[in-house]
Amino acid sequence: MKSAITFLLTVVIVLSISDVAFSQKTAADQCFFKASSLHFTVSGMEYWYDKARGGLESITGVPYSDLGCKNCHIAACDVCHKAEQDGKLVYSNEAATNQDMCLKCHAREASMMKINEKLGTPDVHHTAGLKCTDCHTAREMHGDGTKYISMKQEGAMDVNCEQCHDKITKSISHIIHRSKLDCKACHVQQVVSCTNCHFETMVKEGKRVAIPVSGWSFLMNYNGKVTSANMQTFVASGNKTFMIFAPQFSHSVSKEGKKCEDCHNTANDKEIDNGAMNLTWLDGGEVKQASGIIPVVDGVLYNSVFQNYESGKWTPIADPVKPKVQYVGFGTPLSEKQFKKLLKSQKSQK
């Protein structure tokens, strides 16, 4: 970290001597992060969208290069590091480490924080006063010279729970699950999902419209362990539908983990065991949803409401095409053996 800070300061000094002012937008090729930073390359979104990998492009027919998604990502250093001092624009590390700067782009995390506060179940790290850069490193932000295809790729991220929580209490849950479950599987309270993302509205009007859903969390495999995950659904031209599942850390963490009965032999498990589960449905014109822990199992039909968005209104699609399902972020569904273990009743022990 010290070497990264030293290098960063050197860059600042060089820029100052060269009279490169932030009053003019700094070109990305003048900034050391261009070669590998996911903030700049946007590789993750493009990689999973690609039709060659069974991505959303397979039903939209629109190349990623034609989408505006890539334009939201960081094109130059000054997007994060620009600040005003004495009426002049200056380079600032303080501006870049301000949490509000991160939340300008990371809207899902901002939404999760608001939901947590509304429910009175704030994230333990947020309550403790931690901010994004207390966990996420400069290498993650600026890259290290390696071109990662996704933030989920091994080696792309430094942050993990064990960096701070090196001593784990010897509870029954930890003894049984520690080698098989990631911390997030039990300690993430919920995730917020974007459902019914309307692709045509995004392309034609440049607007992102979707129906947010929270109060649940999914389980899938990632890096050899079961972890928390999320889902997202899309509607494209011709009433084509799409569903993705991916590992996700929602920044909604509780000190107390899940109880055994929150995951084992639940109503959700029983639905899934029968081959289908209703994730969302309509009740009096209002979208309702499942809640709790939802295992991701291949071959199961996860039913969801699909709607068209026209003139500012959602209209249910009478007979939507069965959604194509994609597992992204290097996540994989639970195996049959793993799911069968979830079907066994377990009671929490003190």
What is each model feature region?
Residues 123-124, 137, 188, 260, ...:
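Histidine-centered catalytic micro-motifs
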Residues 7-16:
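Bacterial N-terminal signal peptides
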